[in-house]
A protein has these predicted regions:
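C-terminal motif of bacterial Sec signal peptides marking the signal peptidase cleavage site
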Residues: 27-28
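Acidic/hydrophobic-patterned starts of short beta strands in beta-sheet-rich repeat architectures
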Residues: 215-225
Length: 260
């Protein structure tokens, strides 16, 4: 029995180490050249290899914009205090409108009974959706798509949004196989797959924002896609980071875990 407990403890330590490394890599992997899997693709990028899918992209970068993101929540493996600073901006909602402004935040230490006893919690001073280290857009009101976004509007398979944004028609679809556990879960934009999860559990995924974040009058997305209810995983997709032949590409990702 003691041997079994010891093995479980060792496995949890290994998981914690891997998650910590993953968190850091997701925030810094855009520094690598060339970029694979569309992470941190730059504006003004040069095409190196024609592709059709996001998960097979290789792009040579020229003066890249490296994106890092955080959301207002408690963290166990990521330390927001070493990442965010006064130069960051935030996407926030005021009434029905969305704005980008200078980041206004605070960090406090809270108790964490399942972790090391304490954890940093990043707090926004407004109705903050996302903190970003930089965005190629002027501060102020941003254009948002007219689709329903809420904490309970989950992207279950079969969900479809059809809308017009800044003169262009878009169709967002969620597809998957299976019922209790979704297999090959995918999100498509105008028929092009930009997100895929081999096994998505009950797929409690939802959009946090849909609109223009990079100033090119094209659709950008912020997606919450946790692997389970005790997991944090947020993606930022930008049209300016789209691989050749696609309309949107992953610009940044943040992952953390608060399971016991």
């Amino acid at each position: 029995m003691l041997q079994g407990i010891s093995n479980i403890f060792i496995m949890r330590l290994k998981f914690a180490f891997l998650l910590l490394t993953f968190c850091v890599l997701m925030l810094s992997c855009t520094d690598k050249k060339p970029v694979s899997q569309a992470q941190g693709i730059s504006i003004g990028q040069k095409e190196s290899t024609p592709v059709k899918r996001v998960n097979s992209v290789e792009v040579a970068k020229q003066k890249p914009l490296t994106y890092k993101i955080l959301v207002p929540t408690a963290y166990r493996y990521c330390n927001p205090d070493t990442l965010i600073n006064k130069n960051w901006v935030e996407l926030y909602k005021d009434g029905k409108d969305y704005y980008v402004g200078k980041a206004r935040y605070s960090i406090k230490i809270i108790s964490d009974e399942c972790g090391d006893g304490s954890a940093p919690k990043l707090l926004g001073k407004r109705n903050t959706i996302l903190f970003v280290n930089q965005l190629p857009i002027r501060l102020g009101k941003v254009q948002a798509a007219n689709i329903e976004i809420s904490d309970t509007s989950y992207l279950v398979p079969g969900t479809t949004y059809s809308f017009t944004f800044l003169g262009k028609r878009y169709k967002l679809e969620a597809k998957a196989q299976g019922e209790d556990v979704f297999i090959n879960y995918a999100l498509l934009l105008n028929g092009e797959r930009f997100f895929r999860e081999v096994e998505a559990g009950d797929a409690c995924f939802n959009f946090l924002f849909a609109g223009d974040l990079d100033g090119d009058s094209k659709l950008d997305l912020v997606l919450s896609a946790p692997t389970d209810y005790e997991n944090l995983r947020i993606f930022m997709f930008l049209s300016s980071c789209a691989p050749p032949g696609l309309q949107i590409g992953k610009a940044a990702e943040i992952v953390d875990d608060f399971s016991c």
